[in-house]
């Protein structure tokens, strides 16, 4: 039984990673990609298939079962950290942002949004969390200056 559970978790992890890799590989700024990740279509009331496993005592207490879950979230945090580092290094975000903290914000928002939506049976709770995180990310971006100053006298 445990072997089947491990295989099922590995399949879920692989599917989640594949979907996320595909999204992260799209064209666009780091902000656009991160907000696309936040806003992508999800079955909000069902929740995250990996995140749900962290509420299962059997999974938490069985190293072979929790490992694929842990590995998936570690990978996701790293992938988002790299995305935010790239954005910062390209001048898209303010220079002093902590890319790892932004990655954690995004992951925690999605996971917490699932919990809020499921607890209230209201997808608007998820949407509000996602839009709040997107607004915070927007505040971390460097505004594009389109004004050209005229120095002639």
Which residues fall in each region the model found?
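Amphipathic alpha-helical packing segments from all-alpha helical-bundle domains
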Residues: 11-18, 63-89, 100-104, 131
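Hydrophobic alpha-helical segments that form the core
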Residues: 97-116, 132-136
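Amphipathic alpha-helical segments used for helix-helix packing
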Residues: 32, 44-64
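Hydrophobic alpha-helical connector segments
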Residues: 7, 14, 18-47, 99-106
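C-terminal peripheral helix-coil segments that are non-catalytic and often amphipathic
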Residues: 28-43, 74-90, 109, 120-153
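Short amphipathic alpha-helical segment with a characteristic S/N-K-E followed by hydrophobic residues
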Residues: 1-5
């Amino acid at each position: 039984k445990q072997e089947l559970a491990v295989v099922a978790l590995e399949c879920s992890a692989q599917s989640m990673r594949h979907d996320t890799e595909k999204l992260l590989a799209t064209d666009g700024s780091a902000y656009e990609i991160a907000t696309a990740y936040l806003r992508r279509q999800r079955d909000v009331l069902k929740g995250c298939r990996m995140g749900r496993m962290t509420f299962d005592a059997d999974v938490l207490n069985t190293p072979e079962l929790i490992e694929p879950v842990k590995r998936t979230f570690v990978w996701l945090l790293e992938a988002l950290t790299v995305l935010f580092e790239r954005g910062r290094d390209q001048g898209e975000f303010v220079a002093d942002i902590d890319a790892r903290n932004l990655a954690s914000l995004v992951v925690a928002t999605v996971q917490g949004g699932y919990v809020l939506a499921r607890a209230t049976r209201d997808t608007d709770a998820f949407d509000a969390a996602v839009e709040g995180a997107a607004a915070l990310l927007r505040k971390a971006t460097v505004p594009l200056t389109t004004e050209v100053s005229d120095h002639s006298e």
